[in-house]
């Protein structure tokens, strides 16, 4: 029976997460992972065929990290339920800049030429339904408002992640409420 691997996929993914959080995903390569794990590159390529396979699995892992961030944010902040996603998105851009850039700028899997394309992305339809219910509008109207809110929020988050904007949570919350009140009459 061969010896049990000392370096697991979980250890590799945690290490890639650490490197990405500190230096950005561009700093991730087999050597940087191996150096941080204090091993050769061989265990990495025992677990993964190549770096592309690792990147693909890491994107899912990083998105789960983001989902946990949103859940933790929801539990720690007292605000309107319809503002949790936009506020947590902007906070993630501020707190986890390198992960935000990876997930929502560089590798964002969104190709929009029409409004309906936004709802082809996994999860957006369900989020829009929950949002519509929380603001008390019909689904089609809620989807239009949710998309507008996303585009507005994404702009603020990108400006935050690139260091161009440094509003505190109260200011951002006020801006989002103003936007929503303009749409919900």
Outline where the language-model segments fall.
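Alpha-helical DNA-contacting segments of helix-turn-helix folds
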Residues: 20, 54-62, 70, 103, ...
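Amphipathic C-terminal alpha-helical segment
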Residues: 102, 150-168, 182-185
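Short secondary-structure transition hinges
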Residues: 91-132, 158, 162
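Basic, helix-initiating cap at the start of DNA-binding domains
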Residues: 1-23, 27, 32, 53
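HTH DNA-binding helix-turn interface
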Residues: 22-25, 38, 45-55
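Hydrophobic alpha-helical connector segments
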Residues: 57, 71-98, 149
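Amphipathic alpha-helical packing segments from all-alpha helical-bundle domains
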Residues: 70, 110-137, 141-147, 174-184
């Amino acid at each position: 029976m061969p010896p049990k691997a000392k370096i697991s996929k979980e250890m590799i993914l945690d290490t890639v997460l650490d490197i990405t959080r500190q230096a950005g995903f561009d700093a991730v390569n087999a050597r940087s992972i191996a150096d941080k794990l204090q091993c050769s590159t061989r265990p990495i390529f025992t677990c993964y065929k190549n770096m592309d396979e690792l990147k693909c699995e890491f994107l899912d892992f990083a998105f789960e990290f983001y989902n946990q961030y949103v859940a933790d944010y929801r539990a720690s902040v007292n605000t309107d339920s319809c503002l949790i996603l936009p506020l947590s998105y902007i906070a993630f851009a501020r707190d986890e800049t390198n992960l935000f850039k990876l997930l929502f700028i560089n590798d964002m899997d969104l190709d929009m030429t029409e409004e309906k394309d936004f709802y082809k992305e996994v999860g957006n339809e369900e989020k829009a339904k929950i949002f519509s219910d929380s603001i008390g509008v019909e689904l089609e109207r809620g989807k239009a408002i949710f998309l507008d809110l996303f585009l507005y929020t994404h702009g603020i988050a990108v400006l935050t992640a690139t260091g161009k904007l440094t509003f505190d949570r109260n200011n951002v919350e006020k801006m989002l409420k103003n936007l929503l009140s303009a749409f919900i009459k």
